[in-house]
Each structure stands twice: as C-alpha cells, then as structure tokens.
Amino acid sequence: MSGSTLGKLFCVTVFGESHGPAIGCVVDGCPPGMTLGESDIQHDLDRRKPGTSRHVTQRRESDTAEILSGVYEGRTTGTPIALLIRNEDQRSKDYGNIAATFRPGHADYTYTQKYGFRDPRGGGRSSARLTAPIVGAGAIAKKWLKEKYGIVIRGYMSALGPLDIPFESWDEVDNNAFFSPNAAIVPELEQYMDALRKSGDSVGARVSVVAENVPPGWGEPLYDKLDADLAHALMGLNAVKGVEIGDGMQAARQLGTEHRDEITPAGFLSNHAGGVLGGISSGQAIVAHVAIKPTSSMRLPGRSVDLDGQPIEVVTHGRHDPCVGIRATPIVEALTAIVLMDHALRHRAQCGDVASGVPIVPARLD
C-alpha cells in the first residue's frame, strides 16, 4: 500500500505536497461527542509553523486549519474528520536548478528510483510541510486522551547538535524558539545557530517526549507492541534516523540491577524502560527520544549526479531550516498522541472489561 495512513482504529491519512494548493488529512475513528473546533487544533499548528524565528525557514504560512467534515455543532460525529491547510507562500522557482539533479542526503534520488519521477518543488511529498496536518490530527488525539484519561503529552529539545540541553522545567519549553526546557542555555543555542546560519551549514538535534498518566495495559504483543508502534510512527517523521524508548541504547551498557525498574507498593523506583514492559504500558510515563539528522538542503556545494548519471555540483537555494529539529517538538508530541489514542481504542475493544485484580502500582515514588 502507499504508506500514507497511520493507525488501525484511530487512523490518520495524510495528503498533499509542499507546493501544491493545500495539504491535509482525514482522521477516522474519533469517537462521537467530543467538543472540537478549529481553535483546539490551531494552538499546536502555531507552535510548529514556519517563520516564527530567525533560526527556522522564513517561508510564511499561516497554517490555518479548516475542519471540512466530522464535526457538527461543535461536537465530533464519529465520522471521518477532514482537515485542510492551504499553502500560501510557495516559491517553486527556487527549485528550478535542482529539478534535474539530486541533493545528496535527500529523498530526491530515492523518490525518483521508486516512482520514476518526482515533484522537485520544495521536496514535494517528502517535505516536512506534510507534518502540519499530522500536528492537527495529533491535537485531536491529545484532547481526547486528556479528557478521557487525563493523559498529558509534552515534548522538548534535549540536544542541538553538540550542545546537550539539561532538563530544568516544563514551564520554559514554550518560552523560546527552541522548545528548550532550560532558559539558561538559550543564549548559547542562539549564538550557535547564528554562527551556523552564517556558515551555510546545517545541524541535527534530539527531541524528547513524555506522556504521563497512561494507564497500564496498552499495547498489542507481539508485533503491535506499544513501543514498536511508537517507534514506527516516530521513524515516519522527516529526517528522523533513530528512536529510543526510555534509556534506549544506553541499556546495552547497563547491568540488570541498574536497568530493572524495581517495584514497591508505594511506586516504581525508576523508569529506565520508558514506561513500556513487554510491549505493554506499565502505568509509568512513556518516554521516547528521536535523533534528527541535519537537513541536506544547504547553500554549501556538494557532489551529486544529474538525471543522466553524470557528475554535478549541487547548491540548494530557497528557504530551508538549518536545523529541522527546532520545529519538531509539536510533531513528536502529535505522533505520540496518535499512537496512544489508537492503542487506547484497541485496548478498549479487546480488553475493556478485563479486571486484573492486581493493585495498580503508582508510576513513581512521590
């Protein structure tokens, strides 16, 4: 199949291209009766949209969401919800010089090999522009999860290139352009990005996400485990090259006595597993991290080939994010919410009336 749909019971199908007339998605499976309006979706879209600081692409898009179906008199009807976001600031002429070649490290080459040709304008279907409707769908899922289960999903940037960002406070995340939870390091991040932009290069980033108040029991072993589906969704985000759940790769260096999350009647003593055991939520916070590569669209020349396989030097013009990770936090939150809502509905369908009889252990010691 085409790979444009995420989820099984809560399904999100994305459509559009970066420089087409519009982008959007169809959200199928949202239960009826939830109050929903465009303002519920717009907040997260505004957090993601371009042109919000000097450190991101200067493409100017209002990213205004239109609800075309699935909502009547301010409530979801249980039928598919269609969201539309119109593209307003395309500059397709900026891509004329790369239409007959391939940016090294970009999907230009692989899209052409797969489909036989490609839309070169802004990356076409491979553009991060397509994450806007995902954020819209994620806002719906976040609202439902919060109202139904009290689940709160929050993300932050935990590293920018070589700069680690120590976590300090959730209160700081939306107070700066980097989604940094640490106000003290923001001036250093700004200086780093200013120098990077002047150099013409790009850089990667690490984004972390935490979902709190997820009940125990969600996840479908063996092959639809909660962490497997979360990793699958997060790997679908543009430029993501790695996903960690909990301690992730560090688990390979740990001893069993260190990694195991010991349990007491008063609560779990640690959360190295990231809230998932055996592919099923434990009731602890779901914790994931994504590694985002540097964008390949930059003004520094690089070697490549043209459509005839002949060597050529590529320089990318146009408006690009020098670090795509800066705007990724709302997208990572959205994908996490979509996966959790899908699993909430799947768990309710199969095991909604199961009573284990085992007391629920608090997520952590207070």
UniProtKB/Swiss-Prot annotation:
Pathway recorded for this protein: Metabolic intermediate biosynthesis; chorismate biosynthesis; chorismate from D-erythrose 4-phosphate and phosphoenolpyruvate: step 7/7
EC number: 4.2.3.5
PROSITE patterns xref list: CHORISMATE_SYNTHASE_1, CHORISMATE_SYNTHASE_2, CHORISMATE_SYNTHASE_3
Residues annotated as binding FMN: R125, S126, S127, N238, A239, G278, K293, P294, T295, S296, S297, R319
Cofactor note: Reduced FMN (FMNH(2)).
Keywords: Amino-acid biosynthesis, Aromatic amino acid biosynthesis, FAD, Flavoprotein, FMN, Lyase, NADP
GO process terms (BP): amino acid biosynthetic process; aromatic amino acid family biosynthetic process; chorismate biosynthetic process
Gene3D superfamilies per UniProt: Chorismate synthase AroC
Cofactor: FMNH2
Pfam families per the UniProt record, alphabetical: Chorismate_synt
Gene Ontology CC terms: cytosol
SUPFAM superfamilies from the UniProt entry: Chorismate synthase, AroC (SSF103263)
Family stated for the protein in its record: Belongs to the chorismate synthase family.
HAMAP family, per the entry: Chorismate_synth
Record PANTHER family: CHORISMATE SYNTHASE
Its job: This reaction introduces a second double bond into the aromatic ring system.
Protein name according to UniProt: Chorismate synthase
Organism: Thiobacillus denitrificans (strain ATCC 25259 / T1)
Upper classification of the organism: Bacteria, Pseudomonadati, Pseudomonadota, Betaproteobacteria, Nitrosomonadales
Gene of this entry: aroC
